UniProtKB/Swiss-Prot annotation:
Outcome after substituting residue 493 to A: Does not affect copper content. Strong decrease in catalytic efficiency with both ABTS and SGZ
Protein known as: Laccase
Subcellular location as annotated: Spore coat
Origin species: Bacillus subtilis (strain 168)
Effect upon mutating residue 146 to K: 357-fold decrease in catalytic efficiency with ABTS as substrate. 152-fold decrease in catalytic efficiency with SGZ as substrate
Outcome, altering residue 116 to L: 9-fold decrease in catalytic efficiency with ABTS as substrate. Almost loss of activity with 2,6-DMP as substrate
Residues that hold Cu cation 3 according to the record: 155, 424, 491
Length: 513
């Protein structure tokens, strides 16, 4: 089915309004609901799941240090409309688990562990059933962190890929009042772009595969797939939308909320992006980019200056295929900018060179160095299973950093693909990447480097919480753990990998407790 591109205006998600607000705290309520939305002018309405019945969910905008509480409520149907594989992470408990489980993770949030959205802290409709790690109905987000682009999404055990694909995603923006001095584009010129990919049937329904291609007769049905990319790209819940802009500077907060797909974004007129931030907030200094790679869960904070493009139409393009080349008719396109609106007032916003101060990584303060490898195996059905350090989810915890300590994690990737690795609770700095001989490593376990360590490009010199670990490279990151202790996770953010079984619990310990 061919859908005409750039016929629907880009929706700007509503900002969530608090139920109660005082100097001490702000309280929100959000309900997960089944809903229908018309994703394209020529499509029938699509059944989705959305926060407050919206896809994407409402944007939550908070100030740095604002004490925020959110009651996340599940009002979803008792059965899923996407294919559940009951052979992965099935419950060993005596009580039957509900088919539809949810829990919300604030991605990039520095939050207590009982508000982090631990996969086994799930809850069913009206909290009738809860997972073994469920602790509270109202989550607490202290927002004691830098201004940054965060996002919230489902994180339920073995269901994350399906619940997110169904629509359970939304943006969460922390505003730092100190940013005002930088005079960045603001208000209606500060726009979130939440990018997803889907396959949509002619009747408007979402397609998600119930089995891998050419499945063997022995496979369970439904059966998890190792990856999935839809050929139809949506931004803020619309298929290939357009945005009318003024000939001036705009700030775009770009979030990759896709399950598997990595994008390589550029402007089709050869124009530049000015990157001002990444996952964890502003960069030390702005970076001029002609293109940038955005893996699942990564965020880029960019400025596009349309001043010289009055009257033009510009396509935000993608050159990264998913298991093959991009199709110029489909996934090579993201959205269109139309520089057709008159300038409302003089543009006094800036593209500052220097943005934020950064402490250098103090190598003498490193308390621990961990070597962790990405690995692959097969399950009893012959399906691929990707692992972290050859451990399954339910194996004993092996990563136990102490609160306040700084560690270097050396992540070895001998697999065939790039994996976006996400650590909960912390932001980290990228130290370097170094190529190694995969064949020798697979054969003998010997790490034989084939080139020098390469420091991160300027676009990765800020705070990160999700980072691309490329095939055939050792990635080194430095993280200071805390300020909270408790049970968190780290995982690959390709959701099909995360669900089976590329996710591990992580205990951040406090020796004083």
């Amino acid at each position: 089915m061919t859908l005409e591109k750039f016929v629907d205006a880009l929706p700007i998600p509503d900002t969530l309004k608090p139920v109660q607000q005082s100097k001490e705290k702000t309280y929100y309520e959000v309900t997960m609901e089944e809903c229908t939305h018309q994703l394209h002018r020529d499509l029938p309405p699509t059944r989705l799941w959305g926060y407050n019945g919206l896809f994407p969910g409402p944007t939550i905008e908070v100030k740095r240090n604002e004490n925020v509480y959110v009651k996340w409520m599940n009002n979803l149907p008792s059965t899923h409309f996407l294919p559940i594989d009951h052979t992965i992470h099935h419950s060993d408990s005596q009580h039957e688990e509900p088919e539809v489980k949810t829990v919300v993770h604030l991605h990039g949030g520095v939050t207590p562990d009982d508000s982090d959205g631990y996969p086994e802290a799930w809850f069913s409709k009206d909290f009738e059933q809860t997972g073994p790690y469920f602790k509270r109905e109202v989550y607490h987000y202290p927002n004691q962190q830098r201004g940054a682009i965060l996002w919230y999404h489902d994180h339920a055990m073995a269901l994350t890929r399906l619940n997110v694909y169904a629509g359970l995603v939304g943006a969460y923006i922390i505003h730092d009042p100190k940013e005002k001095r930088l005079k960045l584009p603001s208000d209606e010129y500060d726009v979130p772009l939440l990018i997803t990919d889907r396959t949509i049937n002619e009747d408007g329904s979402l397609f998600y595969p119930s089995a891998p291609e050419n499945p063997s007769p022995s496979l369970p049905n439904p059966s998890i797939v190792p990856a999935f990319c839809g050929e139809t790209i949506l931004v803020n819940g619309k298929v290939w939308p357009y945005l009318e802009v003024e000939p001036r500077k705009y700030r775009f907060r770009v979030i990759n909320a896709s399950n598997t797909r990595t994008y390589n974004l550029s402007l089709d007129n050869g124009g530049d992006f000015i990157q001002i931030g990444s996952d964890g907030g502003l960069l030390p200094r702005s970076v001029k980019l002609n293109s940038f790679s955005l893996a699942p869960a990564e965020r880029y904070d960019i400025i596009i200056d349309f001043t010289a493009y009055e009257g033009e139409s510009i396509i935000l393009a993608n050159s990264a295929g998913c298991g093959g080349d991009v199709n110029p008719e489909t996934d090579a396109n993201i959205m269109q900018f139309r520089v057709t609106k008159p300038l409302a007032q003089k543009d006094e916003s800036r593209k500052p060179k220097y943005l934020a101060s950064y402490p250098s990584v103090q190598h003498e303060r490193i308390q621990n160095i961990r070597t962790l490898k990405l690995a692959g195996t097969q399950d009893e059905y012959g399906r691929p299973v990707l692992l972290l350090n050859n451990k399954r989810w339910h194996d004993p915890v092996t990563e136990t950093p102490k609160v306040g300590t700084t560690e270097i994690w050396s992540i070895i990737n001998p697999t065939r693909g790039t994996h976006p690795i996400h650590l909960h609770l912390v932001s980290f700095r990228v130290l370097d990447r170094r190529p190694f001989d995969i064949a020798r490593y697979q054969e003998s376990g010997e790490l034989s480097y084939t080139g020098p360590a390469v420091p991160p490009p300027p676009s990765e010199k800020g705070w990160k919480d999700t980072i691309q670990a490329h095939a055939g490279e050792v990635l080194r990151i430095a993280a200071t753990f805390g300020p909270y202790s408790g049970r968190y996770v780290w995982h690959c953010h390709i959701l099909e990998h995360e669900d089976y079984d590329m996710m591990r619990p992580m205990d951040i310990t406090d020796p004083h407790k």
